[in-house]
């Protein structure tokens, strides 16, 4: 087997004829500044070729169903194992997909409950069993030898026969006695006495099969088993033992029934919400239905009923419902002055479904009654509008969000149903399985299933996802969470001899959780895989077996291998300047400095009683005109606080359209000092693939106008529109301004051909003849941002330069002016948005919220980012950052650390203050890692 993956002459994107040997079965980190060519090497070369070889090994029929990849532009690649790419993408938009199904843990849970689950009657809570003759034998042996008992079977009257006729038939078959009303009777005596026959109720009559005494002798046991079999046959699957003379009875059945209910025997489809055999019939396995949404009816849970928490009971006419409810509430001691969130479930039910005293009135006053009235008046337009205003996805009233039919919840293991288990956090579920004790039979049956479940749960905890629940929908996960779930699935499958390529697996991870992730990556390596990570996290880089640094800079100034080797060689070059920015930071030559002072503040926005998701009703003070960093381990409540409450609440207070914020009591403090609030996230900058960074920062408008003002353009009658590739007029109509034409091939990769009409230049020939200092519009679009700044600055085009300069300031000087926004990474999208705001001339105080802005950023780029943040603050703006990167945290003016753990054990403020104050907190995980950066 090859010891190396040998790459010769890679020329993908900006890679400059790169050749290198990557050791197999090692943990390899690929680093470099943004745009240096890391992804081109890892994904567009290694993964693309590995996937292409796999697909080409399949039949033409199979290939038509798979993604088609072009052969990378490379001389050759040798020793390449099968490649698996795990990217930062939310893989599933399917509302049925959950953490449990995507990790396959739920499939194993279904099998586990089908194999060893015990069904319990919802009436008596007794276990439902299918009996056999051994159960009857064991029951008899509970009594002392010599104890008399009788084996009976219920009298089964065949349809169309009377009781007398059935007794005659049984008499002819050799049965002499029946048991009824606690006594034995001879059948011939009953048939001879009409009065006695009429007094018998068929359901109380049992046929005597045998009378015996308890004995452990072989012949006696054989006789008992034969009689029991006969009793089951005659009783159509049921029989009874009666011990004499006490008349103590025991019932047995070969049918799965109890308390008059016939139960479904557990099977794996019974626990599948994706199967009609297991899904709740009301919501069809989604867990939600369209109905009256509690969040829309009661948007502010901090208000009481008296204060008007019920939104639909506002106004002169509808307010009468609130007044009447408050008037009646006194009789039932309903606390009308209590905030809605503080009401017990009993009182919430009264508000929604009706007061007990409503039975003394002709009409009920409740939210349900109100909407019944609205539905009854739907023929009026105003009532239809009102109904639509309060309708939304609500928890299914039948399964209460469990997704399964009620029969599935009756099956339990150690008192827990499958619905109970998927509602537990992964960490608690792992503990439950580790503490699970089964009898010998169940342990043997479940051994393999338990191993698979526990392994996968262990990996989820190890990659920092212990706070998730298995019923969490996949489409609500972040890109980082989704990537780590895919990593867990790969680990659980135990594949060996493969090449795993991961794109920044540390995204969304606190430094504490990064340590766990490193252990998982090493486990993946140790079982016989090659693990390649494209990464910037310092801890991961320091733990890699082998480091490849692509650079030295971005775009055309990158694409070279500036360092390859093990980490020992990096440290050997201590404090020595090299071409590699990564090595310079790792060996201590370069570093991100700690600010000499912190900005002071005296104004703040205050959120009172934040309790969305796992937040524990906390009061948070967010300073204005400074940089605040919100830290905490994964799942501690950072996004809930900032993105779920602060952002929508502040937008609504500023009279802007926003989603309903999460639960909180009040927004106080100096929020009126803010004029705008902006969420700078990693979503694409444009909905169209035709949008590009130059259009987003409004530089392209000025460029088009510049070309329209040229003498030749005026002579030809061209306007600014003629220099747009998105509008008719000047663009090439053959390719619609794309420069290429895509030809779909059924069994091969799509052919992307250069447009023959414009030769890839996107515009008509006469438009391209218009030049500005020998550069036409196509030449400008092919320039990088840095080249464009240099070109336009040279000829005094300050407007264009001023709009492009922020892109360079945030480290995006390497991207092309005309590069499609669909090719930008999440981190690049975020920085394009940041550049747009830096370029804005308006001075209205704005609150900027950034969600992990260091995603995809090298140490070298983080310094630029911090300068951009400082530029915004100097203009009077406020910055709040959700971040795990300690280099950013150490530059904060104020830190709010949430935790102490994720999930239910999080949601508290562990500590807050300047970085110097934070490191004194012993309970904070952030303090431990921040201290290393400050001291």
Please name every model-derived segment.
Residues 1-935:
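Conserved phosphate-binding elements of NTP-dependent enzyme cores
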């Amino acid at each position: 087997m090859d010891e190396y993956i040998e790459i010769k002459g890679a020329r993908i994107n900006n890679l400059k004829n790169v050749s290198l040997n990557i050791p197999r079965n090692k943990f390899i980190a690929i680093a470099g500044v943004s745009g240096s060519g890391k992804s081109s090497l890892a994904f567009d070369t290694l993964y693309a070729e590995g996937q292409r070889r796999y697909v080409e090994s399949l039949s033409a029929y199979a290939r038509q169903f798979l993604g088609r990849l072009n052969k990378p532009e490379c001389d050759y690649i040798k020793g390449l194992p099968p490649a698996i790419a795990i990217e930062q993408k939310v893989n599933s938009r399917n509302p049925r997909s959950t953490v449990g199904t995507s990790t396959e843990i739920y499939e194993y849970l279904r099998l586990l409950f089908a194999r060893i689950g015990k069904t319990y009657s919802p009436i008596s809570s007794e276990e439902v069993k299918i009996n056999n003759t051994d159960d009857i034998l064991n029951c008899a042996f509970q009594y002392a030898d010599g104890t008399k008992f009788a084996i009976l079977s219920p009298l089964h009257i065949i349809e169309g026969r009377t009781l007398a006729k059935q007794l005659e038939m049984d008499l002819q078959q050799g049965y002499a006695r029946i048991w009824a009303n606690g006594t034995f009777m001879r059948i011939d005596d009953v048939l001879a006495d009409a009065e006695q026959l009429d007094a018998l109720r068929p359901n109380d009559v049992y046929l005597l099969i045998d009378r015996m005494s308890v004995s452990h002798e072989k012949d006696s046991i054989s006789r008992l088993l034969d009689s029991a079999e006969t009793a089951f046959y005659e009783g159509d699957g049921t029989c009874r033992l009666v011990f004499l003379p006490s008349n103590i009875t025991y019932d047995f059945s070969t049918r799965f029934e109890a308390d008059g209910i016939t139960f479904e025997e557990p099977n794996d489809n019974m626990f599948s919400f994706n199967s009609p055999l297991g899904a709740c019939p009301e919501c069809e396995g989604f867990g939600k239905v369209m109905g009256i949404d509690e969040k829309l009816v009661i948007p502010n849970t901090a208000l009481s009923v008296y204060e008007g928490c019920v939104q639909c009971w506002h106004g002169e006419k509808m307010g009468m419902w609130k007044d009447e409810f408050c008037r009646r509430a006194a009789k039932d001691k309903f606390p009308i002055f209590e905030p809605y969130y503080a009401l017990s479930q009993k009182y919430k039910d009264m508000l929604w479904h009706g007061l007990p005293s409503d039975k003394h009135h002709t009409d009920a006053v409740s939210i349900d009654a109100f909407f019944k009235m609205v539905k009854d008046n739907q023929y009026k337009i105003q009532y239809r509008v009102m109904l639509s205003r309060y309708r939304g996805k609500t928890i299914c009233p039948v399964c209460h969000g469990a997704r399964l039919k009620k029969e599935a919840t009756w099956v339990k293991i150690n008192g827990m149903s499958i619905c109970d288990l998927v509602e537990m956090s992964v960490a608690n579920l792992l503990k439950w399985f580790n503490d699970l004790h089964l009898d010998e039979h169940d342990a043997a049956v479940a051994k393999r299933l338990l191993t698979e479940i526990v392994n996968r749960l262990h990996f989820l905890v190890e990659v920092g996802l212990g706070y998730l629940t298995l019923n969490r929908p996949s489409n609500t996960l972040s890109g980082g969470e989704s990537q780590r779930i895919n990593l867990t699935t790969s680990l659980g499958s135990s594949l060996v001899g493969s090449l795993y390529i991961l794109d920044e697996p540390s995204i969304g991870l606190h430094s504490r959780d990064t340590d766990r992730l490193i252990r998982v990556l090493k486990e993946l390596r140790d079982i016989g895989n090659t693990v390649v990570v494209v990464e910037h996290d310092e801890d991961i880089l320091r733990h890699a077996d082998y480091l490849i640094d692509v650079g030295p800079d971005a775009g055309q100034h990158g694409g070279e291998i500036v360092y390859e080797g093990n980490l020992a060689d990096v440290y050997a070059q201590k404090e020595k300047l090299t071409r590699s920015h990564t090595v310079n930071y790792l060996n201590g030559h370069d570093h991100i400095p700690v600010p000499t002072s912190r900005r002071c503040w005296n104004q703040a926005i205050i959120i009172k009683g934040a309790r969305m998701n796992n937040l524990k009703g906390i009061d948070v003070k967010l300073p204005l005109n400074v940089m605040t960093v919100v830290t905490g381990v994964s799942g501690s409540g950072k996004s809930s606080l900032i993105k779920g409450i602060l952002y929508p609440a502040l937008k609504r207070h500023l009279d802007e359209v926003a989603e309903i914020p999460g639960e909180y009591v009040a927004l106080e403090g100096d929020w009126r000092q803010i004029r705008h609030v902006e969420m700078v996230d990693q979503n694409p900058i444009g909905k169209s693939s035709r949008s590009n960074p130059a259009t987003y920062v409004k530089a392209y408008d000025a460029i088009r106008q510049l070309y329209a003002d040229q003498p030749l353009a005026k002579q030809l009658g061209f306007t600014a529109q003629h220099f747009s590739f998105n509008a008719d007029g000047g663009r090439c109509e053959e390719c619609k301004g794309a420069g290429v034409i895509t030809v779909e091939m059924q069994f091969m990769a799509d052919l992307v051909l250069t447009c023959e009409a414009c030769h890839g230049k996107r515009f008509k020939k006469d438009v391209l003849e218009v030049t500005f200092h020998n550069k036409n519009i196509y030449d400008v679009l092919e320039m990088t941002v840095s080249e464009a700044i240099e070109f336009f600055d040279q000829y005094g085009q300050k407007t264009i330069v001023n709009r492009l300069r922020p892109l360079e300031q945030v480290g995006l000087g390497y991207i092309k002016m005309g590069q499609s926004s669909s090719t930008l990474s999440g981190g690049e999208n975020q920085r394009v948005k940041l550049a747009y705001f830096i370029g804005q001339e308006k001075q209205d105080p704005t609150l900027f919220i950034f969600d992990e802005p260091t995603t995809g950023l090298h140490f070298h780029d983080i310094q630029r980012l911090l300068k951009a943040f400082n530029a915004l603050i100097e203009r009077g703006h406020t910055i709040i950052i959700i971040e795990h990167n300690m280099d950013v945290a150490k530059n904060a003016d104020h830190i709010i650390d949430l935790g102490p753990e994720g999930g239910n054990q999080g949601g508290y403020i562990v500590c807050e203050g300047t970085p110097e104050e934070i490191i004194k907190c012993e309970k904070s995980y952030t303090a431990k890692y921040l201290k290393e950066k400050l001291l």
